[in-house]
């Protein structure tokens, strides 16, 4: 899998955005889809879980899909396999975030192009926790 081309400076600018909807956030504390957003929450980010199989995670209400989130979102952080990203991107575009962040190991060129064509920046194959803690 190729590396994301964003510079360190670009990543730092993205990490200044504080409202994050986390698609695929897990209730299981052993999974990255739980402990990464938990870390971000503990470090000042406003996390909104998006998971149709949960009602509450980290004492925050979960939403079934990204467009159900009532507030504006700066970043849509995705914890789903690459082959499941396209419908998530299509839904996220409707929410008009500034950035869609595909976590480490996630890359879908077709879906990423769709987001970029809609004016949304896309980070892929990078972990927000790792980037924030550098």
Task: Describe the function of each predicted region.
Residues 1-16:
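Short N-terminal or domain-adjacent regulatory/targeting segments
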Residues 104-132:
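Rossmann-fold NAD(P)-binding glycine/threonine-rich loop
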Residues 43-45, 95-99, 118-120:
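A short helix->loop->beta-strand "cap" motif at the edges of active sites that frequently abuts
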């Amino acid at each position: 899998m190729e590396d994301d081309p964003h510079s360190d400076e670009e990543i730092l600018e993205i990490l200044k955005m504080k409202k994050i909807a986390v698609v695929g956030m897990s209730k299981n504390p052993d999974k990255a889809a739980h402990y990464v957003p938990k870390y971000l929450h503990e470090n000042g980010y406003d996390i909104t879980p998006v998971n149709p199989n949960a009602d509450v995670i980290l004492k925050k209400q979960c939403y079934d899909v990204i467009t159900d989130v009532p507030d504006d979102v700066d970043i849509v952080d995705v914890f789903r396999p690459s082959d499941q990203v396209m419908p998530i991107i299509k839904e996220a575009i409707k929410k008009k975030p500034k950035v869609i962040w595909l976590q480490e190991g996630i890359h879908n060129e077709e879906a990423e192009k769709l987001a970029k064509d809609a004016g949304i920046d896309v980070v892929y194959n990078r972990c927000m926790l790792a980037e924030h803690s550098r």
